[in-house]
Regions:
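Membrane-embedded beta-barrel scaffold of Gram-negative outer-membrane proteins
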Residues: 190, 293-323, 460, 466-472, ...
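Transmembrane beta-barrel wall of Gram-negative outer-membrane proteins
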Residues: 173-175, 181-213, 217, 221-259, ...
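Structural signature of Gram-negative outer-membrane beta-barrels, strongest in the C-terminal barrel
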Residues: 239-243, 253, 349-352, 364-366, ...
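Short acidic/polar hinge/loop motifs at secondary-structure boundaries
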Residues: 121-147
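Gram-negative outer-membrane beta-barrel transporters
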Residues: 360, 412, 418-419, 517, ...
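C-terminal beta-signal and adjacent terminal beta-strands/loops
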Residues: 521, 626-637, 656-713
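N-terminal periplasmic accessory domains that precede
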Residues: 77-78, 98-100, 116-119, 143, ...
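N-terminal Sec signal peptide and the immediately downstream disordered periplasmic leader
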Residues: 1-84, 194, 244-245, 292, ...
Length: 713
């Protein structure tokens, strides 16, 4: 099947490359910019569900355009996090990611609803697994910091990430990209074809990609790669615009992801950066993502526009044989499969009533269904009876319905001031049915009703300078623990955020900054371990208590001369648990630190691009980037001594030659081969589980170097 997928993708990419005839309109590759721009260079974003310039929108937002992603070799949202202040994403498996913005919305396991929302073309993705998925044919990424629940709904208390893909074009367009890097045999090929079918009435776009890498970890027990990664993606879009005031866009996609789950090495401490894994199995896991969505937009006249978005998304995963004890002793083995099906429907009405007042109102509905079937085999040695095997099969089905109504009024008393007042009401009903080895358990239910208000006041002091203040509340829904857990449910968490910011934009200079304070209640943080029904132990999610997070962030783009661009961002955030009584009361254990798991106190990035004109359309571009992350608390259940991971800096660089629509580049990532941990679990967790005790760590990627080429007509 993998060979068939690769062949299909390669055929499309090859067709895109060979089909590029001189008759197609040429569009020379632009210097990487911050986001999609209008003809005069003004950056346009849709952070408030309407087109606005980046310098005018009163939200802390970072916009990264598709050409920048390609030039930087960024292939997933997780990888793009280094370019956005305040956004922290780590991962310990192909379908797992930890995400937070400004220390809020912390999501450590995939069973917990995300605290930072991910939206692809306006459609909510309900699981952190999507953060690792390949980015295909992306126009730009927008990272919105602070609660966005008023317009985006629940599960955005930390912020929201918008991924906007390229739409069908009015002229024929072809894009092709390819790269190869070592020493882990990492390569990528992608392509897209777009153009009209019937003039400007009907257009199409098709894109596909293949990516694979061996990774930098080795299973020394099996003499195999322990962190390989393989993806294939394809999507197709049709856009119908029979009249000037109406359009219908339909898109379908299919992603295959084959990789490894939780490839932890047994390490002696947080400075032991070994890359050997000793599992009895390869811990392989495969995912299939597919879906279809449609967006209808109509100009109703009188200053009103109606948008209706419907989507169906499906994710299936299968793990044929997983090692649950993280070592050579064959104690815990797991076989499992699950599915997540999501259907959403949203209707929005954007109306301009007068020159001073406009509104955006809408309703939303989603239905999620999760099915899981997991079989655990626990092998023990009894002192009297000898070897004993416990086989436990757990089947669960969770269903969730969410209903919401929302509205925002925008009031501009004059050309300088704007007041935006929004409110959203979400009602969520969740039901879980499950069984353990054929024994049906009582049905678990969870209901919530939440209001999410937001008030923003902004002033345009000059055409170049804007300031704003805002207060907003966001919340994340609760959920269910495994059927074997003693506590089946946990509640949602919420945050009030207070923010003041400023933006300045002129030719050759863009500056933005913000100060923020978050009052974070019922924090869903570090999970714990509890006795499992039927024997053994089980991981439980729970509300840990309250958190206070405050800080400052800065973002800048400077162009000292026409051919030289500098960009940078910095966030300092002090996120600490102020009340852990909920955690202590539930687990009977103490926390060894008031820090949040995997959350640094600072994040920083700086990059430079210098263009050397060679005459005509030819140029050489010298690029470099420096990305840093502060010290972090490892995942730990130790009650007295916290485990702190070191801070680190990564350095990337490239040199590219461009001639017309063609670009060829040499690049290197993590040039100085810096050692750091992507994820880390302190040994108390294994000790409590009755397993051979050892710290567990996953090291980040080593130095990678290679060549990259792109073509765009």
């Amino acid at each position: 099947m993998t060979k068939f997928r690769f062949a299909a993708v390669s055929t499309l990419v090859l067709a895109a490359t060979l089909g590029a005839a001189p008759a197609f309109a040429q569009d020379s590759t632009a210097t990487p910019a911050a986001a999609e721009t209008e003809d005069d260079g003004v950056i346009v974003v849709t952070a408030r569900k309407r087109d606005e310039t980046l310098s005018d929108v009163p939200i802390a937002v970072t916009a990264i355009d598709g050409d920048t992603l390609t030039a930087r070799g960024i292939n997933s949202v997780r990888e793009a996090a280094v370019l956005s202040p305040g956004l922290n994403i780590n991962s310990d498996g192909s379908g797992r990611a930890f995400v937070a913005i400004r220390g809020v919305g912390v999501t450590l396991v995939q069973s917990v609803q995300p605290g930072v929302g991910l939206f692809i073309d306006g459609i909510y993705q309900p699981n952190t697994a999507y953060l690792n998925n390949p980015l295909l044919d992306v126009a730009r990424i927008e990272v919105l910091r602070g609660p966005q629940g008023t317009l985006y709904g629940k599960n955005t208390l930390g912020g929201a990430i918008n991924v906007i893909t390229r739409q069908p074009s009015d002229v024929f367009e072809v894009r092709a990209n390819g790269s190869y890097a070592g020493p882990d045999n990492s390569w990528l090929v992608s392509g897209a074809v777009s153009g009209p079918i019937a003039g400007d009435v009907l257009g199409f776009r098709i894109a596909a990609s293949h990516r694979q890498q061996d990774g930098f970890l080795t299973n020394t027990l099996l003499n195999k790669d322990a962190n390989r990664f393989n993806t294939d993606s394809i999507n197709a879009t049709l856009r119908l615009a029979p009249s000037e005031g109406f359009s219908l866009t339909v898109k379908g996609y299919y992603d295959w992801v084959d990789g490894v789950n939780v490839p932890y090495s047994r390490v002696s401490g947080p400075k032991d950066y070994r890359r050997d894994v000793q599992f009895n199995t390869l811990n392989e896991i495969s995912y299939k993502y597919r879906g279809i969505n449609a967006r209808a937009e109509a100009d109703l006249g009188g200053g009103s526009k109606l948008s209706v978005i419907g989507a169906y998304d499906m994710r299936n995963s299968f793990s044929p044989d997983s090692d649950g004890d993280f070592g050579p002793v064959n104690t815990v083995r797991t076989v499992g499969r699950d599915s997540l099906r999501t259907m959403t429907l949203e209707t929005r009405l954007d109306s301009e009533w007068t020159d001073q007042i406009s509104t955006l109102v809408g309703v939303f509905y989603s239905n999620e269904a999760t099915n899981a079937d997991v079989t655990d085999t626990i092998s023990l040695v009894h002192p009297v009876f000898g070897p004993i095997s416990i086989v436990r099969n757990t089947v669960s089905k969770n269903v969730a319905d969410t209903y919401a109504a929302f509205g925002t009024m925008f009031w501009k008393p004059n050309s300088d001031w704007e007041v935006a007042l929004g409110l959203r009401y979400d009602r969520e009903n969740r039901v879980s049915r499950s069984s353990i080895s054929g024994t049906i358990l009582p049905t678990a239910k969870l209901k919530s009703s939440e209001w999410q208000p937001k008030l923003t006041v902004s002033r345009k002091w000059t055409p170049d300078l804007m300031t704003y203040v805002s207060v907003a509340r966001g919340y994340r829904g609760g959920g269910f623990n495994a059927p074997t857990a003693p506590t089946r449910t946990y509640n949602g968490d919420s945050a009030w955020t207070y923010e003041a910011g400023a933006k300045y934009a002129t030719s050759g200079l863009m500056l933005s900054g913000a100060v923020f304070y978050n009052d974070y209640k019922n924090y869903i943080g570090l999970n714990s371990i509890a006795p499992a029904a039927g024997g053994g132990l089980v991981t439980v999610d729970l509300n840990s208590g309250d958190v206070e997070s405050y800080g400052v962030e800065l973002e800048a783009m400077v162009r000292p001369v026409r051919n030289w661009t500098l960009r940078g961002g910095f966030t300092y955030m002090h996120a600490r648990i102020t009340d852990d009584s909920a955690y202590v009361g539930t687990t009977g254990r103490q926390l060894s630190s008031d820090r949040l798991t995997f959350q640094p106190d600072w994040l920083a990035n700086i990059s430079t691009d210098y263009r050397i004109e060679m005459g005509g359309d030819d140029e050489v571009v010298l690029s470099a980037g420096l990305f840093g992350k502060g010290k972090r608390l490892a995942a730990t259940l130790n009650e007295t001594t916290p485990t702190i991971l070191d801070s680190y800096w990564l350095t990337n660089a490239s040199i590219a030659y461009r001639t017309g629509p063609v670009e060829v580049a040499l690049f290197a990532n993590n040039i100085f081969n810096t050692e750091y941990f992507e994820s880390y679990i302190e040994k108390t967790t294994l000790l409590l589980a009755g397993l051979p005790a050892s710290d567990l760590g996953i090291t980040g990627d080593r130095r990678r170097y290679g060549v990259r080429a792109s073509l765009k007509f």
